[in-house]
Amino acid sequence: MTQRNLEELLRSVPSTVDMLRNAQVGPNVYPGVPAEYTNWRDEQWGWQNTCVLYNQSFHMAELAVEGPDAMTLLSRLGVNTFGNFDVDRAKQFVPCTPDGYVIGDVILFHLAEEEFNLVGRAPVLNWVTYHAQTGGYDMQVALDQRSALRTDGRRKHYRFQVQGPHAMDVIARALGTQPPELRFFNLTSAEIEGVTVRALRHGMAGQPGWELFGPWEDYEPVHAALVAAGQEFGLRLVGGRAYSSNALESGWIPSPLPAIYTGDELRSYREWLPANGYEGSASIGGSFVSADVEDYYFTPWDLGYGHLVKFDHDFIGREALERMADDEHRHKVTLALHDDDVADTIATMFHKTDRAKFIDWPSAVYSMHPFDLVTVNGDTVGVSTWFGYTSNEAKMLTLAVINEPHAKPGTEVTLLWGEEGGGTSKPTVEPHVQREIRGVVSPVPYVEVVRQSYAPDSWRSAAV
């Protein structure tokens, strides 16, 4: 029997967790760009030392949200405040379930009156589309699917980020003039090679930079102009391998599992979702195993989004989050892994037997949603969610969510690397044995220059 929707699919399997852990899908892919332009070490070096161009035109989906009720719907779904969300502003948009667990996060752009754009992974876009289509709102939505799910090779928009210490020098050269002053997550319009571009003030590398986007027809001239402008400043183009690792330095967790697999209030949503969509195909990987899929859910505080939760409006999940607000929360941290333990784990690749799970470079992520067990003296204290190597710091790092008593920098923990029982049936998993790797709880973001950019008096708080 073919399942018509996600709810039917979940009812057809003995275990939701087993279904997700054995899904035949690897990590998120980054189509449209080479794996490497020079090499991933050089490209990582660029975002800390010169400047880089991230080509984001292919791997993220976009949802246009337009109409008189667009703001009303978005405010109803997001934990964020919308009191000051004027045209030409953007924000990290975080919707939750009625039980207060995160569905995902995307960037929300306010492009014009009654016109918005959501950019990121599918779960949030699906959630917004469902409510737009079923809630009786006076509005429209239109999905522009990511390139991996297209056959025409075209998108509605190109999207380029110029980041790093010399990012604004490159922007000035491409514009032919000094860029206008712009606050963090604010938008402006500018002209490059005779075409109008929209620009968002952003800073993934801890330095002020711009994210530029516009009609797909302008992809080539804008891209060429940025590359030419960057030659003097050592601009690196970033390929898919290095791009997948930049979250380790910036401290953003890309991979919360959408918390929609349980709950009677969400049954109609699961019946709306297709069986073969993102939620029905997503893969979980790692050493953390629980029979209850809700143990894989995150709250906003777990992901470092507690400061975004504002109780100044009515939104789905508000009552649950109000109950949680004063509780002890888990904390997002970086784990700096023990060099010798990592080296010993990698060295098992030269053994005929008892090999560890392969650690790829620079990103060791092998599923869409990584969950590795983190312990102290054998007791579970959290999960690791993103794993990889930064050449800039000469360190293997993970982004983790840790119980408050053990989240203080300097705390020694142990990460269990690899899956139990020799591994699941995911195509990215080979037979292996689990290995313990020691780590030290460290700040997030791990890189000092990125961490300093979040200070109250940093460039993020000023028009620069």
Identify the residue ranges that each predicted region occupies.
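Generic hydrophobic, aliphatic-rich segments that mediate packing or membrane embedding
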Residues: 61, 69-74, 89-91, 102-107, ...
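Short, charge-rich binding segments
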Residues: 84-86, 95-101, 106-112, 134, ...
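Short amphipathic beta-strand starts and helix->beta connectors
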Residues: 43-49, 95-105, 191-200, 381-384
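Internal amphipathic helical hairpin motif
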Residues: 68-102, 165-195
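Acidic, proline/glycine-enriched N-terminal capping motif
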Residues: 1-93, 101-103, 332
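Conserved, structured C-terminal
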Residues: 1-35, 112-464
